[in-house]
Amino acid sequence: MTNERKEVSEAPVNFGANLGLMLDLYDDFLQDPSSVPEDLQVLFSTIKNDDSIVPSLKSTSSQNSDGTIKRVMRLIDNIRQYGHLKADIYPVNPPKRKHVPKLEIEDFDLDQQTLEGISAGIVSDHFADIYDNAYEAILRMEKRYKGPIAFEYTHINNNTERGWLKRRIETPYKVTLNNNEKRALFKQLAYVEGFEKYLHKNFVGAKRFSIEGVDALVPMLQRTITIAAKEGIKNIQIGMAHRGRLNVLTHVLEKPYEMMISEFMHTDPMKFLPEDGSLQLTAGWTGDVKYHLGGIKTTDSYGTMQRIALANNPSHLEIVAPVVEGRTRAAQDDTQRAGAPTTDHHKAMPIIIHGDGAYPGQGINFETMNLGNLKGYSTGGSLHIITNNRIGFTTEPIDARSTTYSTDVAKGYDVPIFHVNADDVEATIEAIDIAMEFRKEFHKDVVIDLVGYRRFGHNEMDEPSITNPVPYQNIRKNDSVEYVFGKKLVNEGVISEDEMHSFIEQVQKELRQAHDKINKADKMDNPDMEKPAELALPLQADEQSFTFDHLKEINDALLTYPDGFNILKKLNKVLKKRHEPFNKEDGLVDWAQAEQLAFATILQDGTPIRLTGQDSERGTFSHRHAVLHDEQTGETYTPLHHVPNQKATFDIHNSPLSEAAVVGFEYGYNVENKKSFNIWEAQYGDFANMSQMIFDNFLFSSRSKWGERSGLTLFLPHAYEGQGPEHSSARLERFLQLAAENNCTVVNLSSSSNYFHLLRAQAASLDSEQMRPLVVMSPKSLLRNKTVAKPIDEFTSGGFEPILTESYQADKVTKVILATGKMFIDLKEALAKNPDESVLLVAIERLYPFPEEEIETLLAQLPNLEEVSWVQEEPKNQGAWLYVYPYVKVLVADKYDLSYHGRIQRAAPAEGDGEIHKLVQNKIIENALKNN
């Protein structure tokens, strides 16, 4: 590996933040070379003898003797670092800055005459051939750094990136738009503004979350997509909240005006869906508000055929960011091959649009940005655009953040930040150009802060002057960017005044024509909102059978390693035991081996697998060992990359210490590539609630709201084992509360073979109408439990079973105990010590959909049954009890007694003391097995 950070010898020329210090050290060196470190002695000796470092030093020795050069360089340094504080980036209501660093020539006891006597090369080496002297160069820098784009990049640690940005920003450049392009740009703005005005006039008070004040967002997106087309990027993934969303849908994804206006009129918009199939819009049966909806457009409008997707989004601001990143990575990965996927960052790019209040306020943004350079998550650079209207509902910046800009928090991720005046549309285009060039060069994120305002209230029913009267006095006086740019083109002679007004009127005419096509009487009235017939049934078992030899061949391959690969002896001993199910009569397949065999057969079927989570390569409980490490060299080997007849990729990554962003990423990946078996594994199930927004707003409701299918699988370690309230419960009750309309499968298993068949069933459902999320309350101590491990013949045939029982004599059973997961195993082991034929244990393997028919059939076979008990280790107000009670109550009816055994109602999930845990657990088991 190479270290991207440059040696200190490059610091004085390129490290703006350290320039003052380096100059002081250089002065010390001139007085006494031994007073500075040896590496700086070498550097300063080079400067002293080589004009290429500071080209003008020799010719300015007289000025340098009185500190002139040092003052010049400090002025330059300040302009680069702090010029943004005086930049012309505010269309209205510029902030009053306090304590602005020195940025003027006179602040450094300099003047025009002095600067004209100094070479331009002292300002920057690339200025030497452009400007006659330092004065001209500094004027250029002042104009550049204090203009309509404010640049922040001196915080970036990478020397090459910072140097590239400095040259790109300071080299004379202007967006060159010919007259036709300027006219086209004005038309874009006319459509953007005209659309909002039409809706405002014709649907008074209707919520639309207008784009007005940051209208330039649309041409910025159009410019971005056009550049991407030229670079061969054919998949664009966009994520944004509600502000300006309707405008982006109509003018970037080309959603017809008729469809949009239909939604305001509550008529059926799908009647106006383009018949050529170029626009894909899915809908759920309960639906969502119009400003949450997304779509996919296939178009050549931007220069080549591209697929442009705007992700569906809830009102939870910013939560869509990791979803978009995941969708992008899925579009970049080639998964239809053996081994690991190959990733091509030129296939797709993400654009994420943020709000200025939500960007620094929501932690999901920083979880997501942290993924940017990680092997398992990088998308080759995201374009972040902040639609900065400088207010959040009623909250002004002084109450919204502790930093100068909403973007300051992005500095920790070593990305450039450009603030641009939203009313200077040509400057916004230039900002996009530089951002896209940087992304292409370095495959890193860029943040553009589009500084504008909000024309109306948070929504169009809100009166902003109640809480923000002074800013809105000025906002109401501010002309729209459409008008500002139009007048500029009139003054330049690009268009006439009549043409400007004609463009504006044409937009209104087109909107009126679209409006007139809609039949007001054609109202949508479907109160039943039934789910699709495909979801009437639970996840179907995969009945494919395997020969003993087939599974043995797979197992042998998984336990074969490259010559010279040195596995830790302790681990090698554990792995060798995985041969036993195939060469010993009493050999059993434990949980981890069952998973490996399932994964291998799924890969042979052509379904790619992607598994991520904290410590997932090894497994939190040291059970999986999917990635092996050579104990001498540290090199890695992944056996699931070498499965015989493998037709798809296996991708596994240890995730960063994040839940929300990582789960959102995997959800997005699976939505984009529905053939991919995506699995997120929590370190402990207790930590899954950090992803609750993803669960609530995407995973469990996306199909109902948006018609968006997902088959994401969650592995959530869950069991009460005396480890305290934060390492016991995956909050099973919350997933069961979210379960409805066959929107998911929730299981808590007690058998390794059932786990094998479950994984295969889930994989088989992918990319079908039956696909749905799978939630596995995965084991901890049961990973190595011999009661859970099963012989190989349970793997060669059969399928997933929603309930499991042991053999029993029907007429002797008087009590049925229903339990799940580890509770079932604890009961089974206790009953084995004191057998009682009157008690029948039933493992409820699948909790949702609840196996009513299977239980009803079982109970009907027991003529002397008197009591049915539900036993769980969770408190009564948690776990599955409150969910299963209505089902079991119906099954029991008046025929049998119904009882509950488990912890009493508790605020916390579990006891903190391990010994107390044992007492409580044993008491539950003892009471449950009593036969009254």
Curated annotation (Swiss-Prot):
Keywords, A to Z, come to: Glycolysis, Oxidoreductase, Thiamine pyrophosphate
For this UniProt entry, which segments traverse the membrane? Answer: none
User: For this protein, what reaction is catalysed?
Assistant: N(6)-[(R)-lipoyl]-L-lysyl-[protein] + 2-oxoglutarate + H(+) = N(6)-[(R)-S(8)-succinyldihydrolipoyl]-L-lysyl-[protein] + CO2
InterPro entries hit by this protein: 2oxoglutarate_DH_E1, 2oxoglutarate_DH_E1_bac, DH_E1, KGD_C_sf, ODO-1/KGD_C, THDP-binding, Transketolase-like_Pyr-bd
An example of a GO molecular function for this protein is: oxoglutarate dehydrogenase (succinyl-transferring) activity
Cofactor(s) this protein cannot do without? thiamine diphosphate
Task: Kindly indicate whether the keyword NAD belongs to this entry.
Answer: no
**Plastid in keyword set:** no
Kindly give the SUPFAM superfamilies that the UniProt entry links to this protein. Thiamin diphosphate-binding fold (THDP-binding)
Enzyme Commission number(s) of this protein: 1.2.4.2
GO terms for cellular component: cytosol; oxoglutarate dehydrogenase complex
Briefly state the protein's biological role: E1 component of the 2-oxoglutarate dehydrogenase (OGDH) complex which catalyzes the decarboxylation of 2-oxoglutarate, the first step in the conversion of 2-oxoglutarate to succinyl-CoA and CO(2).
PANTHER family documented for this protein: 2-OXOADIPATE DEHYDROGENASE COMPLEX COMPONENT E1, 2-OXOGLUTARATE DEHYDROGENASE
Q: How does it assemble?
A: Homodimer. Part of the 2-oxoglutarate dehydrogenase (OGDH) complex composed of E1 (2-oxoglutarate dehydrogenase), E2 (dihydrolipoamide succinyltransferase) and E3 (dihydrolipoamide dehydrogenase); the complex contains multiple copies of the three enzymatic components (E1, E2 and E3).
Q: What is the official name of this protein in its record? A: 2-oxoglutarate dehydrogenase E1 component
Q: Which organism is it from?
A: Staphylococcus aureus (strain bovine RF122 / ET3-1)
Q: Which gene encodes it?
A: odhA
